[in-house]
Amino acid sequence: MTQSQALTQALILALTAPDYARATQASDLAESIAQGLDFDQVEQCKADALLILEMA
């Protein structure tokens, strides 16, 4: 799994978490993963996560 794929999955987890604590945990993970990517990569991951959720 690439860093971009990991970020996309973490964003999906943050958006679909069943409670605030888990959403915060996933959000923190996503933020940590995003540190190694540039702005355009992070924006693409956000778009990918939203697209995946729309298709679900």
Give the predicted meaning of each segment.
Residues 1-24:
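N-terminal acidic leader/helix
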Residues 20-56:
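Short, charge-rich amphipathic interface segments used for partner binding and complex assembly
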